[in-house]
Amino acid sequence: MSSHPPIRSYVLRQGYFSHAQRHAYESLLPRYGIPFSENPIDLDSIFGRTAPKILEIGSGMGETTVEIAAQHPEKDFVAIEVHAPGIGSLLDRIEKHGLTNLRIIPHDAKLVLQHMLTGESLDGIHIFFPDPWPKARHHKRRLIQSDFVSLLCNRLKPGGYLHIATDWEDYAIHSLHVLSSEQRLINTAADYAPRPAYRPLTKFEQRGMKLGHTIRDLIFTKAA
């Protein structure tokens, strides 16, 4: 067995943890959180219904996650986030919006996918603005790698989709190559897809567009 620690796609930075975020984290995580487990979970049982299940990896502060879930009450959403301020912020938003179709798993996405989620259990996967790790020596830390995409495919139902959005051209090119190399995935566009109506424009994205940044969406579906 290798003694090398796994390469992580994130760094747990000690960011500002507001009183409201901390309070939400401590008081609401038992209600809306799903504890990490090395055993598979039944999402239908957790949500109390049979409905399409969408996974979001890296929900940030939760603004987009909550907006999408609020606009689509017919679907169930599972967010994965590791940074405490973001977890607290998302929990606070869930409570204020009264959402019953959104839960969060505060753990490493790769471990969640490997242990908790079963094969062909997801109807869609969102990865919006992952850390681009722009320096060449850090490219190995990028989340979108062939082995990880293969794992995502295993968890997607046939006909399910994988949606990645990034404002880094180099990361978009990298992701397009990795996704196109996965034989089970089919690109819905010639290269980059138009932004679908369900993905709202974030404040971060609007600022970037004013500065001339191009946002690129990649949407692939799993072959039936």
Swiss-Prot record:
GO terms for cellular component: tRNA methyltransferase complex. Keywords: Methyltransferase, S-adenosyl-L-methionine, Transferase, tRNA processing. CDD domains: AdoMet_MTases. One of its GO terms (molecular function) is tRNA (guanine(46)-N7)-methyltransferase activity. The keyword S-adenosyl-L-methionine applies. Its EC number is 2.1.1.33. The active site is at residue 131. It catalyses: guanosine(46) in tRNA + S-adenosyl-L-methionine = N(7)-methylguanosine(46) in tRNA + S-adenosyl-L-homocysteine. Substrate binds at residues 135, 167, 202-205. S-adenosyl-L-methionine binds at residues 56, 81, 108, 131. InterPro entries: SAM-dependent_MTases_sf, tRNA_(Gua-N-7)_MeTrfase_Trmb, tRNA_methyltr_TrmB_bact. It is an enzyme of class 2 (transferase). Pathway: tRNA modification; N(7)-methylguanine-tRNA biosynthesis. Belongs to the class I-like SAM-binding methyltransferase superfamily. TrmB family. HAMAP family: tRNA_methyltr_TrmB. Catalyzes the formation of N(7)-methylguanine at position 46 (m7G46) in tRNA. This is tRNA (guanine-N(7)-)-methyltransferase. The gene is trmB.
